[in-house]
Amino acid sequence: MLSIIGFIITISILVFIHEFGHYCIARYFNVKVEEFSIGFGKALIGITDKKGVRWKICLIPLGGYVKIYGYDRSLMDKTKEVNEKVAFDAKSCLERFLIVAAGPLINYLLAIIIFAGFYCYFGKTEIPPIIGNVVASSPAERADLRAGDKIVKVNDKSVKDFGDVQREILINGFSSSTLTIERKSEEFIVNIMPQEIIISPPEEKQVNKKTLRIGIIAKNESIHTKIGILGGLWEAINTTIDMSALTLNAISQMIVGKRSFDEIGGPIAIAKESGKSIAGGTQMYLLFIAMLSVNLGLLNLLPIPVLDGGHLVFILYEAITGKLPHPKTKNILLQLGAIIIIFLIIIAVSNDIQNLFS
């Protein structure tokens, strides 16, 4: 029950924030907003404000939308004259671009605010990139890494924290990573191929959670630093960028077949994680919201027709060429985008069901 409640609350918060971004910028540019909906299907409750916007909560809590006047004229009442002053498609390319981009960007803004709050309040704890132990029969042992070795670079990128090492290896995925090691004041380079392992968290019933490892354990020491507002904001932005890079890398590896689509989670997976984060307390839940918000913002920026990113591409095409995309071409691309989204939804739900009964 906690998972169901957590899922509804979490999705409602993220969808509201996302759609509110579209709403605010549309209103700023004097574009008429007709509806603001949390959920799909039959309206459970609704109210119409003085500006004529119908605010409602619908039966199926799997998303939401803002109905913007003039967004798609093919769906408008042909018997009524269009009010060009408040129509979306009568605005400039820049104004339309900002309206469409506002949803994903406000998701990023929410995540940055939450992360910044945590950094300012709790500070930052860094674990030096020094190896404390090497796992037997691991890639690290085969590469002759030893306790006390300091990792200076990963794939030519300097690392200052053990988390940096983990991130760079994960971003590189199943490809070999190049580590610059400092041992007794001497530096040398090793190439190491991570191995895929299956982990079974104690609280989980299924055992099909996959991750990558090279088999090193950090030395048991840490450095805690207090961070001011500007420092917290900077760290929050970097954290958001790192999370986006990891997600994009995972997507690209799935496309080329280096990672399995089994890793895609659907509503049941989100519901389970929502329940666990709520049970873990306010701090854990806020971090969960921030991480989901990053992913929601990023996924909506992907150049897939029907998503915000796809519409941004159409607007950019118009801005560069001075011409609207051909209606037939646009419709074909929108249908293709819908097929891609439906395909991903089927995979996500299928994975959820499989994990539920595994």
UniProtKB/Swiss-Prot annotation:
Its cofactor is Zn(2+). It is a multi-pass membrane protein. PROSITE patterns: PDZ. The active site is at E19. Keywords: Cell inner membrane, Cell membrane, Hydrolase, Membrane, Metal-binding, Metalloprotease, Protease, Transmembrane, Transmembrane helix, Zinc. The keyword Protease applies. It is found in: Cell inner membrane. Residues 102-186 form the PDZ domain. The chain crosses the membrane at residues 52-71, 97-119, 285-307, 332-351. The keyword rRNA processing does not apply. InterPro entries: PDZ (IPR001478), PDZ_6 (IPR041489), PDZ_sf (IPR036034), Pept_M50_Zn (IPR004387), Peptidase_M50 (IPR008915). One of its GO terms (biological process) is proteolysis. It comes from the Bacteria. GO terms for molecular function: metal ion binding; metalloendopeptidase activity. GO terms for cellular component: plasma membrane. Zn(2+) binds at H18, H22. SUPFAM superfamilies: PDZ domain-like. Its EC number is 3.4.24.-. CDD domains: cpPDZ_EcRseP-like (cd23081), S2P-M50_PDZ_RseP-like (cd06163). NCBIfam families: RIP metalloprotease RseP. Belongs to the peptidase M50B family. This is Putative zinc metalloprotease RC0203. It comes from Rickettsia conorii (strain ATCC VR-613 / Malish 7).
